[in-house]
């Protein structure tokens, strides 16, 4: 469904605190990023504007049974998938995983300075 080569897929909900901290920075990753919102179009657009989310987003709706989330086995948000050149999953990052996010951070432009995440 969303198997785009060399892409970061990010499943999220607008009510997720970790998503609110993470998504505004993902446009800086040096690869295409596709957000997959589990909320309706209005809530998703409001979230994108409020938190200055600059990545493309598509909807994965409850009314349709969350087809993309089910296809990728997503049970928590945020869940991110790094897809390789064949469009296959190279890495899965679920929730807040500091080590995985640091590896993902290596994809940021050298000139970007992302603030350290300190939950709680």
Residue spans of the language-model regions?
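Non-globular targeting/processing and membrane-anchoring segments
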Residues: 1-7, 21, 28-34, 42-45, ...
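Aromatic-flanked redox-active Cys/Sec active sites in thiol-based oxidoreductases
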Residues: 11-16, 38
């Amino acid at each position: 469904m969303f198997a785009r080569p060399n892409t970061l897929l990010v499943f999220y909900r607008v009510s997720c605190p970790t998503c609110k901290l993470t998504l505004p920075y993902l446009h800086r990753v040096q690869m295409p990023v596709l957000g997959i919102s589990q909320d309706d179009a209005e809530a998703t657009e409001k979230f994108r504007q409020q938190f200055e989310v600059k990545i493309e987003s598509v909807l994965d709706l409850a009314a349709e049974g969350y087809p993309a989330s089910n296809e990728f086995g997503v049970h928590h948000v945020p869940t991110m998938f790094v897809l390789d050149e064949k469009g296959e999953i190279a890495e899965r990052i679920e929730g807040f995983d500091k080590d995985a996010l640091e590896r993902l951070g290596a994809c940021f432009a050298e000139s970007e300075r992302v603030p350290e995440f300190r939950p709680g």
